[in-house]
Amino acid sequence: MKLIVGLGNPGAKYDGTRHNVGFDVVDAVARRLNIEIKQSKANGLYGEGRIDGEKIFLLKPQTFMNRSGESVRPFLEYYNMEVEDLLVIYDDLDLPVGKIRLRQKGSAGGHNGMKSLIAHLGTSDFKRIRVGVDRPAPGETVVQHVLGRYRPEEKDAISEAIDLSAEAAEAFTKKPFLEVMNTFN
């Protein structure tokens, strides 16, 4: 079994914001794999499917970003899954819009959703895809930036990054992660 988690904030007012790019990627994976995300468990919306006989779960925590761990850990426990089976997708201010980075483990890097996951899982040793959303513009706060929408000139780049991240997430279900990293980094 594999669990692919996209981080974001619940509610229509956050749709399309930089902070919700994890949700956008999970939605793209769902379209690629023909999985409906409409079931509810562990404070999250999820869907399930199979790839080459292996069960795959897609999860969008509904706890708000800074409490994401409150959804992911119970979900893993319910299905008796290990942290090794987890891939987390989230926004990263330190990467330009359109860039993605895959890592086998790492720190929270100041990201509150990742801080929550690390605290609730008791480890930072889980796979992740960081999707670049760039730094705030001069005079713009981090909160304004991540809860804001993409500028028109960024839309093509973020769309490509979402598609590439979805492709990488699908590859995670089929191949060793080191191979996936070598392909997509």
UniProtKB/Swiss-Prot annotation:
The record marks N9 as: Discriminates between blocked and unblocked aminoacyl-tRNA. The record marks D91 as: Stabilizes the basic form of H active site to accept a proton. The keyword Hydrolase applies. One of its GO terms (cellular component) is cytoplasm. GO terms for molecular function: peptidyl-tRNA hydrolase activity; tRNA binding. The active site is at H19 (proton acceptor). Disulfide bonds: none annotated. Monomer. This is Peptidyl-tRNA hydrolase.
